Design a protein with these regions (language model features):
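Hydrophobic membrane-insertion alpha-helices, especially the h-region
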Residues: 33-46
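Long, hydrophobic alpha-helical segments that serve as membrane-spanning/inserting helices
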Residues: 1-28, 46-244
């Protein structure tokens, strides 16, 4: 008679076993949940990136419009300053050619020309938008690299102009003005007062040096103004196609 085999003891149920059975039975559900989670995260990141890009584009438009307006105003002012500076240079050249033997025929015209030569046309740039771009760290929203470089070149050129204009003012006040005030009465009330011996002034070294200083300084500034005008037009040409 055959012996009955002893019954096998059931395997102990562990947490790993339970997990294994759950995975076997419900793996499609788990996979679907993982896919849904990944998809949700991806959509969330994409939406955040879209919102960020849209905000940057809107901010860029605000700055581009501000820059365009500022520089457009600058160019109008530059054209006026260039025109006045050219007139100052022409008048200074005319006065430099006078001599005691061939003076200005009219004293009043002579004084008027001297007064005009010492006009100081100034260029004051509108830089509020550019300053805000730098101070807020928003320069990164300007997507065009060439535009950013051109902006820095333009406002660096403006700083050069300010330095030359400041030096011009100091020279005029300390060197030129004291001499002229001793030799001529430049007030409007004196224009009709006849003077004698004034033509001799045109041959004085101090007078010719004063005119030379004015002419050379204004010629330097004229070059700087014209360069700024060129840079400004280039910037407007870069900005205009990007405006909405």
């Amino acid at each position: 008679m055959a012996k009955k085999s002893a019954p096998t003891e059931p395997k102990p149920v562990t947490s790993l076993t339970i997990l294994y059975h759950l995975l076997r039975e419900k793996w499609p559900e788990y996979v679907l949940e993982v896919i849904v989670i990944i998809f949700s995260i991806t959509i969330s990141f994409a939406l955040d990136e879209w919102k960020d890009n849209r905000h940057k584009q809107e901010l860029e438009q605000i700055y581009l419009k501000g820059l365009y307006s500022d520089i457009e105003t600058d160019l109008g002012q530059l054209k006026e300053v260039i025109d006045e500076t050219q007139q100052v240079i022409q008048t200074a050249t005319h006065l430099s050619g006078l001599t005691p033997q061939a003076p200005e025929t009219n004293y009043n015209q002579f004084v008027s020309n001297v007064r005009f030569v010492f006009k100081r046309p100034r260029f004051i740039a509108e830089d509020a938008t550019f300053s805000d771009l730098k101070s807020t760290g928003n320069m990164q929203v300007i997507s065009n690299v060439l535009l950013k470089k051109s902006l820095f070149d333009y406002y660096k050129q403006y700083e050069t102009i300010v330095q030359v204009e400041t030096a011009e003012l100091e020279t005029t006040n300390t060197v030129v003005a004291p001499y002229l005030l001793k030799r001529l009465s430049l007030g409007a009330a004196s224009m009709n007062v006849p003077k004698s011996g004034w033509s001799m002034m045109t041959g004085e070294v101090e007078f010719q040096n004063a005119l030379l200083i004015r002419r050379t300084t204004r010629e330097e500034l004229l070059h700087d103004y014209q360069h700024s005008l060129k840079l400004g037009n280039q910037i407007l040409a870069l900005i205009k196609p990007k405006l909405n």
